[in-house]
A protein has these predicted regions:
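Carbohydrate transferase catalytic cores enriched for Leloir-type hexosyltransferases
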Residues: 1-379
């Protein structure tokens, strides 16, 4: 079988979905010696794929894999994506296509599988959730709803990263339960801290002790409540955020709350640097209002970093008893739970132990195996 994968979002610079695609591709190439893969990528991911080629060259495990790379230069959420991408895919004569994000082209007529990571745009919407003018926002939102609905309707199979997303999808779109399959994401067992802390101290002006948040600062991430919480207990917060969207709005909020001395933004960091930050942090704090899975919390646990997070359904499903939960709408409760964890060595050690045990349940290898099974069923 000839399987196409849309890899235009690939690697850690594209946050959670980029990590998902990278780990899916690498593990499929390790495990699958029967099928041929066509990877559609954009030029800005070329270096990431050079690293993949190097891994293949140096690894006996994936030396016999069959794949080819097709450069597209088609932007996400663009008119080109709807009109040009289907032609590029058709030219490769794939038997099955995997779109690892909701944006499957409406005009693509072949068989495909789609991954729906979350329903955040359904739940967090309106002018307050955008930096664009209101008219343009609603136009793009209409386009999003059309593309999303078509993807859900026409896909042979739908992959979700959690039972929570599956249940919400079925509720909103009346999809048959057998069409939607949960494949939990994983934690990279090569995710290790090789960077010396002194380098981070010099580069980002970070001083111990500090709390850590990793992810975007979109409105649904609820960072304002976290900033209010650290202000209440006078704790330093490091925010690792690769994208600048909503940074200006958040900077204004920080200034209004006189929290400039407490909050440090690092921008994009390498995997090594991120691993070191997880290891050095007193705790990883995740105040999000909506998620599809919650990968950063598992990354934190894998490196012995205690997790304190929102008491929302999906995080309870994924993190189970390995986290301390708070009401994300109440900054006082956020502050109290942070203080409770970091001031009690017994709780800290218990969370570290439970976190390290929990991450053993989540494997990229297992996720790839389950995805390959879905491909076979869909074709």
């Amino acid at each position: 079988m000839k399987i196409g994968i849309d890899c235009r979002i690939y690697g850690p610079k594209h946050t959670g979905i980029g990590r998902y695609v990278q780990n899916l591709v690498e593990n499929l190439l390790i495990q699958d010696k029967e099928n041929e893969y066509v990877l559609f990528i954009n030029k800005d991911s070329e270096n990431d794929f050079e690293n993949l080629k190097l891994k293949i060259k140096n690894s006996f495990q994936i030396s016999n894999c069959k794949f080819q790379i097709v450069f597209t230069d088609v932007s996400h959420y663009s008119l080109q994506e709807q009109l040009l991408l289907p032609k590029l895919i058709k030219k490769q004569k794939v038997d099955l296509m995997h779109f690892p994000h909701f944006n499957a082209p409406v005009f693509y007529g072949g068989k495909y599988v789609v991954t729906i990571h979350d329903l955040i745009k359904h739940l967090s919407k309106g002018p307050s959730t955008t930096t664009r003018c209101t008219a343009l926002y609603w136009l793009k939102y209409l386009g999003y709803k059309i593309v999303f609905k078509q993807a859900v309707k026409r896909a042979e199979k739908i992959i979700t990263p959690s039972q929570y997303v599956k249940d919400e999808l079925i509720k909103l779109y009346k999809v048959g339960a057998d069409k939607v399959i949960v494949t939990y994401e994983g934690v990279d067992n090569k995710f290790q801290a090789n960077t010396k802390y002194k380098i981070l101290n010099t580069k980002y002006k970070i001083k111990n002790p500090f709390l850590l948040y990793v992810g975007s600062v979109y409105p649904h991430k609820n960072i304002e409540r976290l900033i209010e919480a650290v202000k209440l207990i006078d704790k330093k917060l490091v925010i690792v955020c690769a994208r600048n969207v909503f940074r200006d709005r958040l900077n204004n909020f920080i200034a209004q709350n006189s929290a400039e001395d407490l909050v440090t933004f690092t921008g994009y960091v390498s995997n090594d640097e991120l691993a070191r930050l997880y290891q050095e942090a007193e705790a990883f704090v995740f105040p999000t209002l909506s998620e599809g899975f919650g990968l950063p919390g598992l990354e934190a646990m894998s490196l012995g970093c205690p997790v304190i997070c929102s008491d929302i359904s999906v995080l309870k499903e994924v993190y189970k008893n390995a986290a301390v939960y708070f009401n994300p709408l109440d900054s006082k409760d956020v502050a109290e739970k942070i203080k409770l964890v970091i001031s009690d060595k017994e709780i800290l050690e218990k969370l570290k132990k439970q976190g390290l045990e929990l991450v053993k349940e989540y494997s990229w290898q297992k996720m790839a195996q389950e995805t390959l099974k879905i491909y076979k069923e869909a074709a």
